[in-house]
Amino acid sequence: GLFRKLRTEPVILLTEESSMTRDLFYGFDLLTHRVIKINGRYCVTAGFFKNAYRFGQLKDTLVYSETCEFLGVDDSIDLSMANALLAGGASAVVGYVNNVYTVYSRSMLWDTVNYLILGQSIGQAVAHAQATYGTDDLVWYTAQGGKRPHAAAAYTMLLGDADAALPIIEEPADKAPVQQAA
């Protein structure tokens, strides 16, 4: 119709600056809008991950995005990026709905990664971070004494396998011969 409805779509902004040579390299992805250009830089869309990792190359990967609106906003949840990563083989994807306070998202990421390193599953690690910093960023913000919160609370969503964990890497046994007592 005359008044099209427009909505945002999650993208990942790359630090790579666009150029004519790089445009040729990304040619087909640019034509199909799997890669787009914003302010002279490339961005990848969910379609990029669906295409580039369609054979499961992200197997056993845990993805944690601490960016704003990675999973959309309250009235327009958008799981396209998470679903593309899961379709590419990622075991689990964690991201935020709504705009998130940077210090809250960084604290949540730090806590989650530390508890993954301690052997917890992604579900357990995210739950620990939420118990420590709050289930959303407004809980954290008001606990810090904040007086002017933003409009909508940002909260994490976990998609995929909540029991996924970091692989346990076994140290190889020391092959050096043990010296026997004489």
Task: Give, region by region, the residue ranges found by the protein language model.
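Active-site-proximal C-terminal subdomain of hydrolase catalytic domains
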Residues: 61-181
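Short loop/turn segments at strand-loop or loop-helix junctions that form parts
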Residues: 1
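Catalytic cores of nucleophile-dependent amide-cleaving enzymes
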Residues: 5-107
